[in-house]
Design a protein with these regions (language model features):
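Mid-domain Rossmann-like dinucleotide-binding core that forms the NAD(H)/NADP(H) cofactor-binding site
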Residues: 138-221, 227
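Conserved acidic E/D residue at the C-terminus of a beta-strand in Rossmann-like folds
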Residues: 199, 268, 292
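Glycine-rich cofactor phosphate-binding loops and adjacent beta1-alpha1 units
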Residues: 162-166, 206, 211-287, 351-352
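Short Gly/Pro-enriched turn/cap motifs at secondary-structure boundaries
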Residues: 7, 19-20, 53-59, 111-117, ...
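Residue-level recognition of short, solvent-exposed, well-ordered loop/turn junctions
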Residues: 23-25, 77, 166, 259, ...
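NAD(P)H dinucleotide-binding glycine-rich loop of Rossmann-like/cofactor-binding domains
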Residues: 92-174
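Glycine-rich beta-strand-centered segment in the early N-terminal region that forms part
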Residues: 20-35, 48-97, 137-140
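C-terminal hydrophobic helical "lid"/dimerization subdomain
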Residues: 252-256, 295-352
Length: 352
């Protein structure tokens, strides 16, 4: 089958590989229907994730059709259309019982496109299929479902929930990329008074406003942007600052705009250390949270999609075929130039 694989820092390749097979009774084989590209995939190709070995198929977001199940799988059968979570969970280990699926101790957590082969291919082996797959409601679009693999639960769990967004509060989201916009969509569940989007790209800021942001701030001039945010919050700073970029400058920006007793919720994937101003934060009762998504809110988010509370398909800006995946990466890696947010990649090689 065809698959997009990590080769070495700076290089990935679309190659022929063996089709996956059932290895354990709890496995399923899924024919990928649609997938996408995550910013984390770009980090891997850059070499920021050394645990990813050469030859690993990339990708951890997608939907598909079940081709085969192991004898231990009871919730799914051949022909079922499924949402594939970016996180595998055995459901039985110490961390799974606490709902922390990201750290499942039995071939679980974020392993797709990282520690095992991922979804940017014709077929995928899914460990712990009963807990990793979800049945898809008939009235939801493929595009909406793909967004539910990773970015929607990431923005919600790591940004909104860890940030403790609540009615009437002020929220600044740093980065109007896919995760930042996912946080924006799901923050609206809690009716904050102010949703301030911060970015360098005016086009993305306009998109954020169309998605429900109450204010937009261009941060090309940091000091001016900080002043603007304080002016919007009665000189107090924001109650919640969601970092959705993953670079030192944006984390530092969050530290400078957070108000007393506020929470900095870090969603971004950081490849370098950041300065942590604990000497200034402790006396102002500042909370800082981080996290890797567990996707334990996926059932809740599926219900929100079914009731049309949010429309994550609006994040999709570009469409490609699997045979065009190299072009898809070219566009996504230069997202600002192409006004790209999320791309959809459809399997045109092994169609039903």
């Amino acid at each position: 089958m065809k698959a997009y694989t990590y080769v070495k820092p700076g290089l990935a390749s679309f190659v022929d590989v063996d089709k996956p097979v059932i290895r354990k009774p709890t496995d399923a084989i899924v024919r990928i229907v649609k997938t996408t590209i995550c910013g984390t995939d770009l980090h891997i190709i850059k070499g920021d994730v050394p645990a990813c070995q050469s030859g690993t198929i990339l990708g951890h977001e997608g939907i598909g059709i079940v081709e085969e199940v192991g004898e231990g799988v009871s919730n799914f059968k051949k022909g079922d259309k499924v949402l594939i979570s970016c996180v595998c969970a055995c459901g039985k280990c110490y961390y799974c019982k606490k709902g922390i699926y990201a750290h499942c101790e039995d071939e679980g957590g974020w392993i797709f496109g990282h520690l095992i082969d991922g979804m940017q291919a014709e077929y995928l082996r899914v460990p712990h299929a009963d807990n990793t797959l979800y049945h898809t409601p008939e009235d939801l679009s493929d595009e909406a479902l793909v967004m539910l693999s990773d970015i929607l639960p990431t923005g919600y769990e790591i940004g909104v929930l860890k940030g403790k967004v609540e009615p009437g509060c002020s929220v600044a989201i740093i980065g109007s990329g896919p995760v930042g916009l996912a946080a924006l969509l799901t923050a609206q569940f809690y009716s904050p008074a102010k949703l301030i989007m911060v970015d360098l790209d005016d086009n993305r800021l306009e998109t954020a406003v169309s998605f429900g942001a109450t204010h937009k701030v261009n941060s090309s001039d940091h000091e001016k942007a900080i002043k603007e945010i304080y002016d919007l919050t009665d000189r107090r700073g924001v109650d919640v600052a969601i970092e959705a970029v993953g670079i030192p400058a944006t984390f530092d920006f969050c530290q400078k705009i957070i108000g007393v007793d506020g929470t900095v919720a870090n969603c971004g994937v950081h490849g370098k250390p950041v300065e942590f101003d604990l000497d200034k934060l402790w006396i102002r009762n500042i909370n800082v949270t981080t996290g890797l998504v567990s996707t334990n809110t996926t059932p809740q988010l599926l219900k929100a999609l079914e009731s049309h509370k949010i429309e994550p398909e609006k994040l999709v800006t570009h469409y490609f075929k699997l045979s065009e995946i190299e072009k898809a990466y070219e566009v996504f890696s230069k997202a600002a130039d192409h006004h790209a947010i999320k791309v959809i990649i459809e399997n045109d090689i092994s169609e039903a």
